[in-house]
Each structure stands twice: as structure tokens, then as C-alpha cells.
Amino acid sequence: MIKFLAVHPGPLMYTKIYLRLEPIGLELVAQAARQAGHNVRLLDLQVEAQETYFRLVEAWTPDAIGFSCNYLANVPEIIDLAKATKALLPNVFILIGGHSASFVAKELLRHGEGAIDCVLKGEGESAIVRALAAVGEDRKALSSVPGAVSIEGDGPPASFVPDLDEVSPARDLVAHRRKYFIGVLDPCASIEFTRGCPWDCSFCSAWTFYGRSYRMRSTERIIEDLARIREPGIFIVDDVAFIQSKQGFEIGEAIAKRGIKKQYYLETRGDVLLRNKDVFAFWKSLGMHYMFLGVEAIDEEGLAMHRKRISLGKNFEALEAARALGVTVAINLIADPSWDRKRFEVIRQWCLEIPEIVTISVNTPYPGTESWLTESRSLQTRDYRLFDIQHAVLPTTLSLPEFYEELVKTQDVLNRKHLRWSALKSTAKLAAWHLVRGQTNFLSMLWKFRSVYDPNLQLADHYRPVHYELDPPSALQSSGSGLLSIHAARGRRGRALDDATERFVDKTRAGSTP
């Protein structure tokens, strides 16, 4: 039996204000390790101090520590923690896994300078069991673990979890569950209905990670999981919710039958909403009050750049449909570094004219995305910490100080519309309800914006000493899913979609990836 400590790194810029989600991916990995008979603990540095981590490491002396690395901006923190941990416990086995880690595995090993023993690419639930077995028996056996990358060599290609029903999140291992929230859903738990995305947007690495596969959990296991959750708010973590109406209705009907009362927040595409309006209307009756729509751009040129094969008219029609449902809608727009002052002003005026919550992120090429291969040669920085969709890593048309001035001015639209005290008039009862229950995550958003989103602070981030830098794409690489994919594409058989939905997806994506 191995003593295994699973660790989630600290918060990023936007998680200090808008949301703080439970580490469901790490909970799944932890449960898989526990089911294999190991002694497992989980520590989330989003809500715990690093001092707590080091006290636990010294007191418990784990045999293995696994860091979750889903975001590039966390890489320096994880590397430094690994090095400091090895100094305390030279024999501890340190591994890193997660979405972003899968695309930069070799770089992580190099940055670690011997402190990192292994990087696990791909889904972690099955890989962690075999990796921990190797730690306890024969570390040379790591070379046979699918997805394992170590200094000694690489294992076979990453493999999928055979059945998503096999493992449920180890929610009991998380110490501060009331710290997790998204917007007004405070506290909020997370749940997974499906995994993967069948579309192929150029700015996204979800489809390359999963090889454009799409898999579903059974309704029975979803309901079992949901019934055990005590939090009143639920964030559905699927990349695109309710692609197929049948599954949406089946889960919803089972929820109604069990009498489960929750409030739900989900993410979907505008064309999926328009195709399956009846499903979303049904879920509104079940408690779906909040929805995120990936609009990305308000002009056809922007949509084409991000390879979203949905017309501007359809996006606006989807917004109307969501309004008709009576749900609170949040949308994201991607600010391109090429924007000038006039473009920012157009966006600001549009944001002020619509009722939706608007967030603004910065166009950022990531390893694993097609835009990484096509745009990264013009990167103006390779500092991992700036790859958080809140900093400009590509050259800007405006000077960098001017770009951040305009960006924060535009982001402040959200603050003016939804986060200032005047906006609380419509949510006064909700705010009071949170306070009575001792929940302050939602209310803290009201005054945190100015302390986090500051153009001077964002500019200063570019001048911090840089100890770890991303490798640029190899000059030999070219665009193509085979070079990008972590899990090999399995074509049509890898997608649990009915034929009509498969045809719908093909008509609404721009690529030719199988």
C-alpha cells in the first residue's frame, strides 16, 4: 500500500473573483488510487496555504505525490513545490498529470532537474493505478504504463478509462467544500455527465486531448453521484452540455423522479441550444438558472478565425432563446491582441446594450491547440505564468500598456453591470441568504475586481524574473490532429453520438479531423 498525496495547485487570476471549482479531476484520480487499496489524501492549494502542504508532507511523509496541472500558468508553482519537496523527502516519488501537463511533459521533466520522476499524459484514473504499482514494486515498470513519460523513457500511448462509471469523485477527501462556488452558486459542487468534445475549434485543446471522442456516463451513476452531493449548486463540467437531447431528457427525468432539488450551471454552444431547445427548457424547470454560451466573437471574421462554424445570426438567435428561457446567461468574448482602441470601444458599447454577463479573455495560443502551431512563432513571451488568457502573449497593435488599459476598461463593463453594489438590488435576497448561511464567496466578488484586474499589475507581470519558459513548437511540426492528440483519434466509433447528432456536428465544425 502506497501513501499517496494528491495536490491541486493554487488559484489563478480569474479564479480569485468569478469562480473557484472543486478539483473534480483530481478527486477522480484520488478515488481510483483509493479503490486500488492505497492510502490517499488530497490537498487543494486553491483554499489551503503552501505552509499547510509542507506541514502535511513532513508529518505524513507520503511515498508518492501527484500534482494536478490543468493550467499552464500553474507550471512554475508546481515545479518549485516539487523541488522543495524533494529537498525535504529525497526518496518521495513525484509525478505530474493533467490536461496541460500532457502537452508539455518533456518540458516539465527538464524544468524539474531531477525533482520530477514522471509525467502522466492523458486520463489519470487508470494510469495512476499502474504508476503507483510501479512505485511500490519496481520503478522500472513505469516504462510499461500508458502515458507515462520519465527521464528513462516513454511508456505506451495514453489510454482511456475503459468505463466512465468505474470511478466517482472522492469528494470526502476535500476539506473545505464550502469554499467552492461559481457566481451566485455558493457553495457549488461539480459533476461530469460526459467527457470529450466532437468539435475542433482552433483555440481549444479539449478535442485534441481526447482525440475528438465523446463518451457518456450512465444515467444511473450520474444520479447516484448527484444524490450524494450536499451543496445546493451544481456546475456541470461537460465541455458542451446536452449535445444529444435523449441523454438530457433521461438524466432530467431521473432527477425529477428522485426529487433532487438543485440549481445548475452549465456550458453549451449556441447551435446546440437552438437544436435542443426543449431539453434546456426542461432543465430550466429542474433548476437550471445559469448558462454559459461560448460566443467568442461578435463578427463573422472573428468566428472564422476561431474556426467556429456558426453564423453570427445563429449566435444572436441563441442569446434570444436563452433569454426566452428566463435563465441568466454569461458569454465570453476573445480579445485579439490586434485590437485597437476603436475595436475595444465597439465591444464595450455592445456589452452595455445586452443583458448578458460578459467576460473578456485574451486570445492565447496553447500547446495542444492548432493556434499554437500557427501563431506561436510570434510569441512575445514564453513565461508560463502569462498563459492564463488574461495576459497578451502575442504582439499587440497598441502598446502593451495601452492594450491592458483598454482590456481592463472593457472588462470593467462586467463590474459595472453585475458586480457593483447597485447591481445587488435585484439579488438582495440572495445575498442576504448567502450571509445567513455564512457563505461569502459570492459577496467577495463585489470588491475584488479592482484589486485583481489592474492594468498596471498586468503590465508588471511581464517584467517579473522568468525561471521557466515554454518551448516553442518544433520547426518540423505542422498543423494536424495526429501531432496534437494525446489520446489517439478513433473516428466515428470513438463518439457515443446518434447518427443525426454526428451529422449535425459535422455540419457545424470547420475542420476535417476524423
What are these regions (language model features)?
Residues 107-128, 280-291, 347-361:
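Structural recognition of alpha->loop->beta junctions
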Residues 60, 251-255, 341-357, 418:
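Short, electropositive alpha-helical surface patch
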